[in-house]
Amino acid sequence: TIESNDKIVAFIDSLELPKILKNDSNINHTSSDGQKFNIKSSIDSTNAGFSFKYFGTAKGVSVYTFIDESHKLFYSTVINVSERESGYVIDGLMHNEVVKSDIHSTDTHGFSEVIFGLTHLLGFSFAPRIKNFKDQQLYGINSPKDYQNKGYILLPKRKINFEIIEENWDDILRFILTIKSRRTTASQLLKRLTSYSKHHKLYTAIKEFGKIIKTNFLLVYIDKVELRQRIEKQLNKSEASNRFAKAIFFGNNAEFIFASQEEQNIANNCKRLIQNAVILWNYLYID
């Protein structure tokens, strides 16, 4: 089903009409978002979790799906509802064969300082939608007092710890090369780093580097209304795609009936295949 999806996505990409939907013909803006689905009550799945907000007393999973400006669904995976979506952002950007992203957006659940650092080093511009901007922390090259003395209105919380970044720089580059090799996923590597009782020094160093990238993005984000509008527009496509997925995934009371993550991913990619086929049909019909 993954190969079939890739072929449809590649064919859509070869059409002229989808190119009209892009803001910039030289830049591909993508986004990702999670959608919750119930697991059938009689199914015992280790990949399912509880969330009263979404499932009440039942269990369910989260389907994390990637979409580009032309509405092509180029990657999707089923994850445990208790996991943070941000850990899977890089998986979709690196482990698909047909869509090259230049700018990637998520909602608040999809970003972290570590993801800011990793996406920058991998060559992607990470541009999430920021909720409660006033609660976000800025970081500076110098101490906060230096910026205060210069009369800056926006002040950093503290100075970046360049020492820990420099000490672990070689390991950071090795980590990036491992992700680029695609022998394993970034989500698996990050799980390993965060499994230690204390923060691993490599994880801490990547996070510290990410604070630099995040701070720069926040300053641009608050200054440029066009950027905020572009991010909102792209994330609206993710949310519209989720509603479309609900309409497609109507069998079995819109519940997953498989226990293993592998089977759940097969079912999910079949749903994605139908969605991509409908999108392709619409392009051909309009054209």
Each model region followed by its residue ranges:
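Short, conserved catalytic/metal-binding motifs centered on acidic residues
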Residues: 1, 30-36, 104-109
